[in-house]
């Protein structure tokens, strides 16, 4: 079973560290018992640092296979998908999220 985490309340842009930290906390709490579907409906942009904090942290806390088994994305734009990928890459390159 997966729980949907809607990011529409943060739309149209997720750019502050405070928002990213709140989203990360919510996702970590849900991941204790459920898989997640992250719904990006109405989100047009996300800062790379926000993606690094949220998805880089989660990616580094589990292996790649587990990350993609437990976290799915819907309603993403090509820009959002690229930002998520870059956030994960930057987290891995820096050695910390």
What do the predicted segments below correspond to?
Residues 11-35, 40-89:
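Amphipathic alpha-helical interaction surfaces in cytosolic regulatory modules
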Residues 1-8:
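N-terminal presequence-like segments and adjacent domain-start helices
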């Amino acid at each position: 079973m997966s729980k949907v985490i809607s990011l529409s309340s943060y739309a149209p842009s997720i750019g502050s560290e405070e928002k990213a930290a709140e989203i990360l906390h919510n996702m970590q709490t849900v991941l204790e018992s459920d898989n997640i579907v992250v719904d990006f409906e109405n989100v047009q942009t996300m800062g790379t640092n926000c993606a690094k904090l949220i998805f880089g942290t989660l990616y580094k806390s589990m292996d790649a296979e587990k990350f993609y088994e437990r976290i799915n994305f819907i309603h993403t734009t090509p820009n959002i998908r690229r930002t998520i990928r870059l956030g994960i890459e930057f987290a891995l390159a820096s050695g910390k999220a």
